[in-house]
Amino acid sequence: MKKILALLMALTLVLSFAACGKKDVVEVTTTPITMGADAAVNADDFKTTAAPETTTALVEVTDESGEVVTDASGEAVTEVITEKTTTLAEKPIKDWTKAEMLYAYNQAVIKTEKGQIPTGQSTMKLAGGITGDGAIGSILEVLSPAAEKALAKNSTPTDFIPGYGELRGEDLKAIQIIDNGKTYTIEMTVKSQTDGPDADDKAGPVGRAIGTLGSIEGALKELGASFKSGRETVSLTYDDVSIRAEIDKTTGTIVHGQWHYVVKVLVGDAKASISVLTANLKNLRANIDYTVVI
């Protein structure tokens, strides 16, 4: 993902960049997520925690015969007992609240360790051509097919679950659950997010849900590129964000999933260089479809 921005800003690298990565391009099949009418969320859905609540009680300690145990002064010995209320596993899925669905998903992300799931595929592709103003626009039109090929060849196998198990109710547009018998599927759509050149890759709705590019410096340094001017005109908008995760009821881990967004790259007015090459970029735009399927 972090090579994408550098590729777009250093257009002369496209042909050489296309030569790296796997020789065989792997196609993946994604399934559109259709939300039901009652899947939309509002603030009231997440006012209370979905984690199982605990109750405590002070009780007298008894011996094997049921007699109350006393101390040296004759006072009854007591202890604090902590018990959890009904867990999600004991509650019918059809009765889960939206907060409980989100809690179950976050816990599944945390529980699912690398190597526990089948290897999937991380894919990148252009969603439309690369465009720009002036002379650079015609160059971009020619290079778009090569960029598409470069992105495809840098799509890689993965057994990594995106996200960190920290998704919040306020990040969601909608959430729903489907009972499959031995598994259940949680589907979510996530709010869009726009970042500047110095963002935190774990911050914001999309950062918490999947992860973003973050600061552009890593991408620039990786390919030896830099901005001479106009760095502040760079923005990345993450849109069409969705998650589907199938979770095993017994283990609480993710067995299959799909994570998706389109990142809309904009360079408003900047001068970028790589090695001895420099390009003036004005209103450079590219939409990149990013998908992980496990």
Walk through the language-model features, giving the residues of each.
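Positively charged n-region of N-terminal signal peptides that target proteins for export
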Residues: 1-4, 8
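C-terminal motif of bacterial Sec signal peptides marking the signal peptidase cleavage site
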Residues: 16-19
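Subset-of-secretome marker
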Residues: 24-27, 32-60, 66-69, 74-294
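Repetitive helical segments and hydrophobic/amphipathic motifs
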Residues: 11-12
